[in-house]
Amino acid sequence: MPELPEVETVRRGLEQKLNNFIIKKVEICRYSTVAFPTNKEEFIKGLRNSLIYKWDRRGKYLIAQLKEVQNEHTQLPLENSQNNGFLVVHLRMTGYFKFIENSSNPCKHTRVRFFDKNNNELRYIDVRSFGQMWWINNDLSLNKIIKGLGSLGPEPFSKDFNANYLKKVISKRTKSIKAILLDQTIVAGIGNIYADESLYSAGISPFREARTIKKNELIKLKESIVTVLKKSIGSGGTTFSDFRDLEGENGNFGLQTNVYRRTGKECRKCGNLIERQKITGRSTHWCPKCQK
């Protein structure tokens, strides 16, 4: 599943490529992809003649702020124009966007297509079809419609995410620290890859009970999380299967991982063999010598 760095990579690509993209036509190829409104024609009608004004990210969610366009001669930019709600996207396991100039026939796993007046297309492709989209108008609350969005913990790059916060939320937790990092209500956007890599960087065993981790270790863990995420974003995220950026390129961070998917290989620090075991149903990779 795309995690924070992959979703941020997509966000940056969308922001760069779709500057002043006005949606003139929407085609839904798989209706189950649209989670809200339940009336799919309302989704299409709501997005038509909307300018994708700004792309944001919250955890693993992409959020496009929309502006209403009265006619084709409307002057850009539209800072003071009326808002037209939000287009929210969760890529889930295999979803990704592709920008296509002079649109061609859709490929097999195309789920939703957005066109501008010049027939340029923003195409959403999803092999396993777990991804979802929402169009939410200004009269409704994003957090109420999308329950997962409203329950997210702080962003790893935010001031709210620090050692004091971590100490408070884990003080009575008997869960493993790996399970804590995967909990989106505690910290948003971290998944299996970056939990493993961050714990390795911090020298903390993924099996440690969260409440046993000391303040100085949490300081290092927070710093490791930020460093690992920034490094991955700089490499365009990680591709092990389906993830692609807007240009169809793979992410390159997978070539730099220290433990993730390196089972049986030598630790880059100590030479000990990397091991793998499941925690809460998720494959976990670690170095038994470097992580305590």
UniProtKB/Swiss-Prot annotation:
Pfam families: Fapy_DNA_glyco, H2TH, zf-FPG_IleRS. A zinc finger (FPG-type) spans 258-292. Its EC number is 3.2.2.23, 4.2.99.18. Its cofactor is Zn(2+). It catalyses: Hydrolysis of DNA containing ring-opened 7-methylguanine residues, releasing 2,6-diamino-4-hydroxy-5-(N-methyl)formamidopyrimidine; 2'-deoxyribonucleotide-(2'-deoxyribose 5'-phosphate)-2'-deoxyribonucleotide-DNA = a 3'-end 2'-deoxyribonucleotide-(2,3-dehydro-2,3-deoxyribose 5'-phosphate)-DNA + a 5'-end 5'-phospho-2'-deoxyribonucleoside-DNA + H(+). DNA binds at residues 109, 128, 173. GO terms for molecular function: 8-oxo-7,8-dihydroguanine DNA N-glycosylase activity; class I DNA-(apurinic or apyrimidinic site) endonuclease activity; damaged DNA binding; zinc ion binding. Keywords: DNA damage, DNA repair, DNA-binding, Glycosidase, Hydrolase, Lyase, Metal-binding, Multifunctional enzyme, Zinc, Zinc-finger. Involved in base excision repair of DNA damaged by oxidation or by mutagenic agents. Acts as a DNA glycosylase that recognizes and removes damaged bases. Has a preference for oxidized purines, such as 7,8-dihydro-8-oxoguanine (8-oxoG). Has AP (apurinic/apyrimidinic) lyase activity and introduces nicks in the DNA strand. Cleaves the DNA backbone by beta-delta elimination to generate a single-strand break at the site of the removed base with both 3'- and 5'-phosphates. Belongs to the FPG family. Monomer. This is Formamidopyrimidine-DNA glycosylase. It comes from Prochlorococcus marinus (strain AS9601). The lineage of its organism: Bacteria, Bacillati, Cyanobacteriota, Cyanophyceae, Synechococcales.
